[in-house]
C-alpha cells in the first residue's frame, strides 16, 4: 500500500520539479536543454539514495574494475539520464529533424503493414528514439516499458510517448506493490 507521504508530499513535489524543468527545457534550445539536464543530474544524482545502489550494481557487474572506473561509469549514467530527460521536451523537433530511417531489405518486410514483426532493441541513450523512428515509418508500433514510479509524472510521459513514440505495454512498477 502506498504511504500517505508519497501520495500527499513526495509525488506532488517530484511532479512540480518535473513540470518546472520540462518547461525550462522546452523554452531552451535543444543543445542548451541537454547541457542543463546533464548539469542537474550529474550534480544532484550522486547525492540521491539510488546512487548507492548504482555503485553497488556496477561493482557487481564489473567486479574487475577499480573504484575510479566504477565512479566514472556512474557519472556517465547520470549524464545519460540528464541528456535523455531534457530531450523529452523536444521530442517533436527531434522526430522532425534528427531521425532518418533508411529502408533496406530487412526494413521493407518490417514496414509492410500486412506483416507482423518483433524488433528487439537495445539503447545507450534516449530510449524513446527507436520507437519514434519506427513510428515515423509505420503507425502500428508497440513497446514494452517499465513506467516511472511517480504516477503523476507517468501520466505526462505516457501522453508524450503516445503522441510521438509507441503504444505501450507496461510492466508492474514497484509503486504498484
Regions found by a protein language model. Give the residues of each.
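Conserved beta-strand termini and adjacent loop/short-helix elements that scaffold enzyme active sites
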Residues: 102-104, 144-146, 171
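Single conserved hydrophobic/aromatic residue that forms the stacking wall/gate
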Residues: 169-177
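Active-site catalytic microenvironments for nucleophilic, acid-base chemistry
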Residues: 27, 133-137, 173
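Membrane-anchoring hydrophobic helices of lipid-metabolizing enzymes
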Residues: 2-121, 154-160, 165
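Catalytic core of membrane glycerolipid acyltransferases/transacylases, capturing the structured
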Residues: 115-168
